Regions:
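N-terminal auxiliary interaction/assembly segments of multi-subunit proteins
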Residues: 1, 5-233
Length: 233
């Protein structure tokens, strides 16, 4: 296991922007604005990474055509349960009950989350290189995830979500090292990364400025129609 903070500087910036932007995916589900932070990416063998996962998870394998590779999104069941419960009016609390499969409703929420994550990642990557992320398959047991060989190296990007009054939770996005290899020079380049960081900073500042503009909202609750004769009485 090794940290690649310096080797893949641009990827760290992409992850930081993703952490700020992906909150918009979870806000409609959780009905509160979560705080999401990114950890420095790490390189591990897929066997080492998957051995640290529980036997029951949501694992979504997606294709990145431009890089001729793939991406794996990993969500723990407690994370899925929380988003599902809150989305349909339940309490904002973690369900730790042991189980081995997701409900049909949870499967729909998993799809919503993964679609949102993919769209945000596409936006966050485009300053470095355009990518399109397409769903391929979904699995619930890490042993059956047809992602890469067990000895292959993967870059694991972990994100932690913090919400009021409950323990923090995390989810992962993993790329095979081979998938990002064609971009290694771009990902290591401080010059290219500075461009990415500059573009991200400008966009983030603009978004923040727009969201802080006060808006005057008026609402007509009713418009009664009264004749002049009744009004004069």
């Amino acid at each position: 296991q090794m940290c690649i903070r310096d080797s893949y500087y641009a990827l760290r910036l992409i992850n930081e922007r993703f952490a700020r932007t992906v909150r918009g995916v979870f806000l409609p589900l959780l009905r509160v604005q979560p705080r999401i932070s990114s950890f420095p990416p790490e390189v591990k063998s897929f066997e080492e990474y998957s051995s640290g996962l529980d036997a029951f998870m949501s694992l979504t394998n997606s294709r990145i055509d431009e890089l001729r590779g793939s991406m794996l999104t990993v969500l723990p069941p407690s994370f899925v349960s929380l988003c599902t419960s809150s989305r349909y009016g339940g309490k904002l609390e973690v369900n730790d009950a042991s189980r081995t499969e997701f409900t049909a409703t949870e499967e729909k929420i998993i799809e919503v989350i993964n679609n949102g994550i993919s769209q945000v990642l596409e936006q966050c990557w485009k300053d470095l290189t355009p990518i399109s992320i397409k769903f391929q398959s979904r699995e619930q047991n890490p042993q059956f995830a047809a992602f890469v060989e067990s000895t292959d190296l993967v870059i694991v990007c972990s994100f932690v979500m913090q919400l009021p009054n409950i323990d923090s939770m995390s989810f992962d996005v993993a790329y095979p090292l081979q998938t990002l290899k064609p971009l290694s020079s771009l990902l290591r380049s401080r010059v290219q990364s500075d461009v990415v960081e500059s573009n991200m900073t400008w966009r983030d500042k603009l978004e923040k400025a727009i969201l802080e503009i006060p808006l005057l909202v008026k609402s007509n609750l009713s418009e009664p129609v009264v004749s002049m004769s009744k009004l004069l009485r």
